[in-house]
């Protein structure tokens, strides 16, 4: 876990050793993570209340078979309240995931996504972000 990272309990994670968290990350309470497939959260990311990230799932026909795919959240991402992120997803740099979204596929850099399933509503101007 990187410096200046703040995690507000309670949170729940399975296989926490497969989670890598960068610097200046904030994770609010109610966070749940099934991380068998691996999870990377890069620097300057904010994860709001009651978010769920799943990196593993059960096979549709043989429920004892578990499939794992990593989730990667890139730098400077803002994830709103009650968001669910499913296995295999990469969320691009500077992206915003709106409250209640269910993210089933990759989110491009600078995109604002909302809904179930999440879809791109607009793109942010990358030149307007505060530089480190």
Name each region found by the language model.
Residues 76, 94, 111:
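Catalytic-loop signature of eukaryotic-like protein kinases
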Residues 108-109, 114-117:
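Acidic, glycine-centered active-site loop in nucleotide-sugar glycosyltransferases
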